[in-house]
Amino acid sequence: MKKLTNNTMLGKLTLILNAVVLLLFIISMMMLLKFDKTNQVVISQRAGYEKAYEEYVMAQHPLKQDSAEVAYYQYKLDTLQQKTAASKDEKKTLSETIETTKQTLADKQKQQEQHLAQVAELEKEYGPAHENWEQLNSDNDAAKKKFWVIAWITIVAFLLKTFVFAHWGAKNNQNLQNIAPWMKDGMKPWMSYVAWFVPIYNLIKPLSFTKEVWNETDYSLEDAGIVTRDENSVDNSNLFMSIWWAFLLCSVWVMNFILFSTFFREGAFYVKTNHGSMVVIAIVIMVICMCLETVMILGYNKKNKQLLENESKF
């Protein structure tokens, strides 16, 4: 008699974690839409604010020159007024120069006052606009932070669920190692963890690992006379698992890329897609993926029970 383990509880734990991940994902999508609402306001008002800011800054540029010119002509006037003329002609020239300087100083002061008035007028418009802009950005940052908090919790929950699923697969593989001599040439239990967590490798290997466990279990049940080939063939397991894997890849990689491009970039996805529809599609794909995975786990748990109930035949 070979030693077999009951792994159905690990499968059920995976299902519970799936429900938690799905709930967190839906909440994160709602938070993403709230962020999108404030973010679209910020983006729509950015051009107007930047124009107002540029006008306000440009209006301030002449003030430094005005101050320098007023100071220069004031100093020149003070110097001329302290100067004494040695002759009548020099006195006349000095007097004319003083009058010219006074007039120039008055013109510069008037110009300075005009520029100050323009800045003051622009400040009346820019001040509230700046406060509104700061408030919009503050609200937007707060909404983004709330989303990322939920998003990271969802990611951690998904990684935990993935680990439990990988452990479930490893335990099922170990059962096969114990009852099927030919499995010594197949994948080892530890490869379940490698398949799920090694980048690039995890794009296809989890599917092939799961298929091998499922198919070899079917063969073991047939070989022991517990089920017939016809009974195993009706479930179309290979096609079913391929569809599950396609939805999983789409949910984890494709939709996350689309969501990131839609909500955190300002390119084609942001402009041309309906943001609410993208969220709905992401949720629907996730729900389908979870449903397929649920059916698959429950299906294999049934096979696990069949192995245990007929352990003496191996």
Label for each model-derived stretch:
Residues 189-211:
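Hydrophobic, aromatic-rich membrane-embedded alpha-helical segments
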Residues 206-243:
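Membrane-interface alpha-helices
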Residues 238, 244-314:
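Juxtamembrane transition segments at transmembrane-helix termini in multipass membrane proteins
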Residues 33-148:
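Low-complexity, proline/glycine-enriched hydrophobic segments characteristic of transmembrane helices
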Residues 21-40, 254-256:
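Alpha-helical transmembrane segments of multi-pass membrane proteins
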Residues 168-177, 207-219, 291-314:
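Cytosolic juxtamembrane helix at the C-terminal end of the final transmembrane segment
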